[in-house]
A protein has these predicted regions:
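N-terminal loops that bind phosphate or other acidic moieties
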Residues: 1-120, 124-343
Length: 343
């Protein structure tokens, strides 16, 4: 079930036991792929579609969203340079470009946006963001006051550096179709691009080693070095957009969840981000997920309640994973838990 469906099921469960209680639903994404869709469900926006250069240099239609006040644009690099835009047998990271990302950014600035929030998951590229830089240079924006006056925030959930054995080429390029030899060449290209950038005085050698610069085939590096972007965890950006801190001020309990909760939950996933905000606000936080693996005890140590919505349901996994089953089990779990509340 989707985040929205999980919220709806939880609300039904609460009201079946506590009909007078107010439930505020906030369907949440971690800010990766799907960022724009999630933002559009949270705040009023207007979609904008433009033709840009795709990852393999063919024209593609890229859609992003502009807040109705015209101030902020929300976009995903995958809309212009994503892996899903390239057939599996046509994936060539040695040729793939982020040029279209630069065109999207330029279009948003030309539309008058003063802030751009961009998710950089799902890339087909490994050009270090060089294509994006070229696009902005070609339209005269790269060194302009307009781009200097634009705040760019990047939803980035990987901490890889630009190059090296833990960098963009070695870690991510094989997933994009690169051979072992191409991985080595791509890494050399990224080093060369960083060196050229340093010679221009735009970055220092330390910049390429910063966490997140290797994201999206090194696009994180170009955004940081050339556009002075701020790299933030995707969930933190989404929580801010949702006005989460103010929303939970009057809450008695906050409930979050995911398909399966385990040690990876505490590595920047939605539930982890929600938990951290709740701890700051001194609010009880429940974790209700489809499955729980807490052998290390990290979940029970950080959440006030940790529970699988499928506890007591012995039906086979394929049935438990069906949307209707999951929603009913969410309703029942929440309803039963609310029997013990005094609110």
């Amino acid at each position: 079930m989707s985040a929205e469906e999980a919220c709806n099921a939880a609300a039904i469960g609460v009201h079946s036991t506590l009909p007078g209680v107010e439930v505020v639903a906030l369907p949440m994404s971690d800010g990766g792929e799907g960022l724009v869709e999630c933002v559009r469900k949270m705040i009023p926006t207007t979609p904008r579609s433009i033709m840009v250069v795709g990852p393999m240099s063919k024209k593609v239609e890229a859609t992003y969203a502009i807040a109705t006040d015209g101030y902020t644009a929300y976009m995903e690099m995958a809309a212009a340079s994503g892996l899903t835009l390239v057939a599996e047998n046509e994936r060539k990271p040695m040729m793939a470009t982020t040029y279209g990302v630069g065109e999207m950014i330029a279009d948003a600035i030309q539309q008058g946006c003063k802030k751009i929030v961009i998710g950089i998951g799902g890339s087909a590229t490994c050009d270090g963001g060089k294509g994006m830089v070229e696009a902005l240079r070609n339209c005269g924006l790269l060194s302009s006051d307009a781009i200097k006056d634009t705040k760019i925030v990047v939803a980035c959930d990987v901490d890889n550096p630009l190059y090296g054995k833990n960098g963009a080429a070695y870690i991510f390029a094989p997933q994009k179709g690169a051979t072992k030899e191409e991985v080595e060449l791509l890494d050399k290209r990224l080093r060369s691009f960083a060196h050229d950038t340093e010679l221009l005085g735009i970055a220092t050698p330390a910049t390429a080693l910063l966490p997140g610069t290797g994201a999206a085939g090194g696009l994180g590096y170009a955004l940081l070095a050339y556009l002075k972007a701020e790299l933030k965890a995707g969930i933190e950006i989404m929580l801010d957009i949702a006005n989460f801190d103010n929303t939970i001020m009057d809450a008695d309990i906050v409930v979050t969840g995911e398909g399966k909760s385990d040690h990876q939950t505490m590595m920047g996933k939605v539930a982890h981000g929600v938990m951290k905000r709740c701890r700051k606000a001194n609010k009880p936080i429940w974790l209700l997920s489809g499955a729980i693996d807490d052998e290390e005890g990290m979940l029970s140590k950080n959440f006030d309640l940790v529970k699988s919505i499928n506890d007591g349901d012995s039906r086979p996994l394929p049935i438990l994973m069906q949307k209707e089953t999951a929603m009913k089990n969410m309703e029942k779990t929440i309803s039963d838990l609310c029997l013990h509340l005094n609110i």
